Design a protein with these regions (language model features):
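Hydrophobic N-terminal alpha-helices or hydrophobic patches in metabolic proteins across all domains
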Residues: 1-127
Length: 127
């Protein structure tokens, strides 16, 4: 089953294992029409999905395109996403809870857009 959005990573980030990360770039799911593999776009983070994946913290930034013409939902913050698009939020959550098989990934919880921005800054590679 395909992802419920455009799945990728945030450039210039690395979740350092010594700091509790998974050793990869920060994951992102952009809720938008299908993008080409390798496309880079500006986004607005609207929330963070925190998961336990086989005992390891797995952080997913949820975002929408910054360009209003590319947005398929009119949510640019966590409050609007959870109230106006609660079913979309549940689809994203359920997909990530089941994509590796039943019971492998467990929900820690959702966090807001401010938390998403903090995570992006936390894992940004110093230039």
């Amino acid at each position: 089953m395909s992802y419920p959005g455009n799945y990728g990573f945030i450039p210039s980030t690395l979740m350092d294992e010594e700091l509790g990360g998974d050793g990869d770039a920060l994951d992102i799911l952009v809720i938008a029409e299908s993008l080409e593999t390798g496309d880079t776009i500006s986004v607005i983070p609207i929330g963070t999905l925190l998961l336990n994946d086989s005992g390891e913290l797995d952080t997913k930034i949820i975002a929408v395109p910054a360009d209003p013409k590319k947005q398929v939902i009119q949510a640019t913050d966590y409050q609007t996403f959870t109230v106006k698009y609660n079913m979309a939020q549940r689809i994203v959550e359920n997909w990530f809870l089941n994509y590796k098989g039943l019971g492998i990934t467990k929900l820690i919880g959702w966090r807001n857009d401010a938390f998403a921005m903090q995570e992006i800054e936390k894992w940004r590679i110093p230039q």
